[in-house]
Design a protein with these regions (language model features):
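Short, small-residue-biased leader/transition segments that mark boundaries at the very start
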Residues: 2-4
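Gly-rich Lys/Arg/Thr-decorated short loops/hinges at beta-loop-alpha junctions or inter-strand turns
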Residues: 8
Length: 70
């Protein structure tokens, strides 16, 4: 199950994808949010408060998502 939270950076953890797929998903999310970010240690980071947008995008792709920490 993926968890998303925000503290100036939107973090997506627990994505059941390999590294290459994770990087591709990170690029999709960053482009959709018009923001920078990175993928490291299995966590997608998108700069800024994009929790709602990221959740919608992931749910539209069939992922189970929950918001963590607020």
């Amino acid at each position: 199950q993926m968890c998303i939270r925000d503290r100036g950076v939107t973090l997506v953890r627990g994505v059941p994808l390999d590294d290459a797929e994770l990087v591709a998903l990170g690029k999709q999310l960053k482009a959709a949010c018009g923001s920078g970010g990175t993928v490291k240690d299995g966590v997608i980071e998108v700069q800024g408060d994009h929790v709602e947008r990221v959740m919608q995008l992931l749910q539209a792709q069939g992922h189970k998502v929950k918001r963590a920490g607020g």
